Swiss-Prot record:
Subcellular location: Cell outer membrane
Function (record text): Part of the outer membrane protein assembly complex, which is involved in assembly and insertion of beta-barrel proteins into the outer membrane.
Originating species: Ferrimonas balearica (strain DSM 9799 / CCM 4581 / KCTC 23876 / PAT)
GO biological process, one term: protein insertion into membrane
Signal peptide: 1-19
Lineage: Bacteria, Pseudomonadati, Pseudomonadota, Gammaproteobacteria, Alteromonadales
Record-given protein name: Outer membrane protein assembly factor BamC
Predominant cellular place of this UniProt entry's protein: membrane
Length: 365
């Protein structure tokens, strides 16, 4: 047993680190940088009296542009493919002609405040990634330090750990009309190094842009997930049947009271009213009112059972007003002068109206 301990002790000094390359090395070309030591080629000198040979220019290296970074060569040259902003979420697109890293966002649901949606989505995204927020004020969200560590070498004594620490700023703006806005991102702090911060590592503008684009793309992907989930939920709710009972609106007028939100009932009325013989000639969601003409010959019930089962209404113009009442919605039937219809008339219409609202959306096609 003593011999084994001595053998292990003898091997320990010659242990070498085994690991992968650092993040800094992964952006560099493989194969070394001996080409940096190569002298500039000398032009071919043709003696007097001889014709110069024809030379192909196919493989000539173009001259650097005026704005090119001339010292970005060798290990400083990033060989990774470029990143670009990917506007994958519904209602997002790239803002052209700007140097900032920005994505434009448009509202895709009228009942959702766009500024609040963008703000809440970014906070939920950061929370999902376990990223703390250092500042959240007036449309600007600044993250706390985001730390990523990677073990790139192991020994019996300790691991070699490469650490990257970053902070980002999201700047959100929504136009006054509330239908469109933008998200701009910037990498505001960056530190990295092997077993500690290496102050000699200075990010280029391209590096900063690359990190920021990657973070923004992750945020947009999260928004895509959120919007698709919300749309799927809304479609499910819109397709369900809606229970209705006789009741009163806020003015104590006899009305149909639907067990659904205003938006659900508003969308459903487009399908229900024509089946009852109402032709929609105008609608105003701000007024929460459908302006209709009652034409019983064109209705679902008249075509199915005949004239004896028409609604107890005279042909002509009417108004149908919706009123949100918490999680329920009142539906008030009125004449063309916005006078509520008599209680007896509304009661006689209830069964047919309630039966159609109770049907699922696919059964109303």
């Amino acid at each position: 047993m003593k011999h084994n301990r001595l053998a292990i002790a003898a091997l320990a000094p010659v242990l070498i680190l085994v690991g992968c390359s650092t993040p800094l090395e992964r952006r560099q070309a493989s194969g070394g940088f001996d080409y940096l030591e190569q002298p500039a080629p000398t032009p071919l000198v043709v003696p007097a009296g001889l014709d110069a040979p024809r030379l192909s220019r196919e493989f000539d290296i173009p001259k650097l542009g005026d704005n090119a970074e001339r010292d970005v060569v060798g290990p400083r040259l990033d060989v990774r493919p470029p990143l670009q902003v990917l506007p994958l979420a519904p209602g997002t697109r790239i803002q052209d002609g700007v140097d900032s890293i920005t994505v434009l966002v448009e509202s895709n649901q009228d009942d959702i405040d766009l500024a609040q949606e963008i703000h809440d989505t970014l906070l939920k995204f950061l929370d999902d990634k376990s990223i703390n927020v250092a500042r959240d004020d007036s449309g600007v969200i600044v993250t706390d330090w985001i730390e990523n560590e990677e073990v790139i070498g192991k020994s019996w004594f300790r691991d070699k750990v490469y650490q990257i620490r970053q902070r980002y700023e999201f700047d959100t703006v929504v136009k006054d009309h509330g239908r469109s806005g933008s998200i701009t991102i910037e990498l505001v702090d960056h530190e990295e190094g092997l077993d500690g911060v290496d102050d000699s590592i200075v990010l280029t503008d391209a590096d900063r842009r690359r990190y920021a684009i990657d973070m923004l793309n992750n945020a947009i992907a999260y928004m895509n997930f959120e919007r698709q989930q919300r749309q799927a939920t809304q479609e499910l709710l819109n397709g369900r049947g809606i229970k209705t009972e006789l009741g009163f609106d806020s003015d104590e007028n006899t009305a149909f009271v639907a067990e659904a939100s205003f938006d659900q009932v508003w969308r459903r009325m487009d399908k229900v009213l024509p089946l009852l013989g109402f032709q929609v000639r105008d609608l105003d969601q701000q007024l929460a009112t459908y302006f209709v003409d009652y034409e019983p010959d064109g209705g679902f019930w008249a075509s199915l059972w005949g004239d004896n089962d028409e609604l107890p209404l005279e042909e002509g113009p009417y108004q149908i007003r919706l009123e949100p009442m918490g999680e329920r919605t009142a539906i008030t039937l009125m004449d063309n002068e916005a006078n509520p219809l008599p209680t007896e008339t509304v009661t006689q219409m209830y069964n047919r109206f309630a039966e159609l609202l109770q049907k699922e959306s696919r059964d109303l096609q």
